Amino acid sequence: MKNRVISLLMASLLLVLSVIVAPFYKAEAATVVNTPFVAVFSNFDSSQWEKADWANGSVFNCVWKPSQVTFSNGKMILTLDREYGGSYPYKSGEYRTKSFFGYGYYEVRMKAAKNVGIVSSFFTYTGPSDNNPWDEIDIEFLGKDTTKVQFNWYKNGVGGNEYLHNLGFDASQDFHTYGFEWRPDYIDFYVDGKKVYRGTRNIPVTPGKIMMNLWPGIGVDEWLGRYDGRTPLQAEYEYVKYYPNGVPQDNPTPTPTIAPSTPTNPNLPLKGDVNGDGHVNSSDYSLFKRYLLRVIDRFPVGDQSVADVNRDGRIDSTDLTMLKRYLIRAIPSL
C-alpha cells in the first residue's frame, strides 16, 4: 500500500499536473455525460478519446506518447518501452475521455501488465488543470503481484483509502472485468460481476475523465518494488462501459461467454453464426478474427452471407466490431 511517502509524492504530482498538463486538459470544453456510454476498442475514436502527449513527472518515470497507444484485433494496447534522447528513460501510453463522468457504474475488460515496479490502471480523475479539486477513483494493478488488485480514491487530494483484494487468479494471464459503482455515500468495487469491496468514507464528488495508463515508478520502491527496466511491457483493454443509473440489472457484465442466441425462425440463416452451430457466441468471434487475418479463407457455415453482420454487402472489420458489440450487450440484436 501507499504510505506517507507516497502521499507526499502524490501531493507534489498534483502541483506538477497543474502546471504541465493544464494546456492539454483545457483543449476541450467540459462536458458531463449523463447517458450510458460504451466504448469498444476496435480503433481510435478521436471524437471521444485522447492519447496523452506529455509527462506527469514525480513518481511517473516516463513520458506519455500517442505512439504508445495502439489498436489491434479488437483491443487497445498500452506499451511501455525505452525512450532515447528525451528527458525520461521510458515512454508509455495513457488514454482518456474528452468528456467527464459523474455518479454511476464504470466497467473495464482488461489484461494487466506483469513486472516489478509498474502499474496498469483504470480510473477516473479530475484536478486543478480542469479548474476542479483533485478527485479520483482507482483500480490499479501493481505489476509485482498481479494476483491482487488495489482499490483507492481521493477527495480534494486526500487519499489513504487503499485496499488490496486477492483475485484468486493472475490478472496478467487473461481478460477479466473490473468495475466500480460510485454513489454520494459509497463506492462498490466489482471483479467479474461480483461485488468485492465497499468504501464509505471521504467519497469524491466531482465528475472526472475515464482514464487508463501503464507506467514505471521511481522513488516508490516500497510500494511497487524497484523497476528493473524490462521492456517492452503491455496492458490490454477490450472495452469501457459507463451507466449513470448504476449497475445494469444489478449485475455487471461477467467475463464468461454470453449465453448463445437462437434464431426465432430456424429456417433463416443466423447473422454472426459463422461456424454454423446454430448459436452466436465467442467461438464465432474468434473464427471471424482468423478470417480477417487470412488464417482461413472461408467460414465453415455454408451461407457465407451470415458474416455480413451489418448487411452492407461486404465482410470486413466493421462486421467484427458489430459482432463484438452484440456479444458484450452493447446492442440488443444483429
Curated annotation (Swiss-Prot):
Regions that span the bilayer: none
InterPro entries assigned to the protein according to its UniProt record, in alphabetical order: Beta-glucanase/XTH, Beta_glucanase, ConA-like_dom_sf, Dockerin_1_rpt, Dockerin_dom, Dockerin_dom_sf, EF_Hand_1_Ca_BS, GH16
Pfam families: Dockerin_1, Glyco_hydro_16
GO molecular function ontology, one term from the record: licheninase activity
Signal peptide: 1-27
Active site as annotated: 136, 140
Domain of life of the organism encoding this protein: Bacteria
Catalytic activity: Hydrolysis of (1->4)-beta-D-glucosidic linkages in beta-D-glucans containing (1->3)- and (1->4)-bonds
One Gene Ontology term from the biological process aspect of the record: polysaccharide catabolic process
Keyword check for Signal: yes
Residue ranges of every copy of the GH16 domain listed in the record: 28-248
Enzyme Commission number(s) of this protein: 3.2.1.73
Coiled coil: none
Keyword annotations from UniProtKB, A to Z: Glycosidase, Hydrolase, Signal
Residue ranges of every copy of the Dockerin domain listed in the record: 267-334
NCBIfam families: BGlucanaseBglS
Family: Belongs to the glycosyl hydrolase 16 family.
Subunit relationships: May form part of a multienzyme complex (cellulosome).
Name of this chain's protein: Beta-glucanase
Lineage of the organism: Bacteria, Bacillati, Bacillota, Clostridia, Eubacteriales
